[in-house]
């Protein structure tokens, strides 16, 4: 994880009806737009600053945003439980949710329209890769290319989904009474479990980055909603 403190960007809200999507347009205005779609539980600040700079130096205009229910974007009121919905997912019982990944893809289109961008490249990470697949499938004329990072092309199921150890760590993220330090410890355990083996994530830099993301947006309730949309 990297907390992106890159300077010189334009930021604001793309608005439609009761929905507000918070974005950062890193520029330059004359660059070729690249839409960055973050994954499950991630904020726009998670995109590495060196990646932003490399894109800019290569003539591109990176644009990142917070998915709904994440970061500074609109929050939805429903409060689903992790365990009951995971059991439905595991038993192949239909899951109800307030919106779908298709709606999250429409949020990205709304942002492009707001910024008057007719066509761009798109890069999606994890759940953002799933959202981006829907984007390019439904709006092929709006994208030059599509890059998928650490994602998949189908809905995960109990045979190819996360291990029970990862599921347990994800479930802990739904605990509302966790302290900031407990949340930082949990992030270290999660990234150590799913990240590159042998790499030490429990560093002062990483812990500071997680702490900054918590300070930016202290509400983790949208994480469960997003996870349900992947299971649905």
Please provide the spans of the model-predicted regions:
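Flexible "cap/lid" loop of the alpha/beta hydrolase fold
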Residues: 146-178
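N-terminal cap/lid segment of alpha/beta-hydrolase-fold proteins
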Residues: 2-20
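Conserved small/polar residues in nucleotide/adenosyl-binding loops
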Residues: 228-231
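Conserved HGGG/HGGXW glycine-rich cap/lid loop of the alpha/beta-hydrolase fold
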Residues: 19-91
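Short glycine-enriched nucleophile-adjacent loop
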Residues: 129-140, 146
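Conserved acidic catalytic loop of the alpha/beta-hydrolase fold
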Residues: 95-98, 102-120
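Conserved alpha/beta-hydrolase catalytic His-Asp/Glu region
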Residues: 181-226
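Short beta-strand immediately N-terminal to the catalytic nucleophile in serine-hydrolase-like folds
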Residues: 122-124, 149
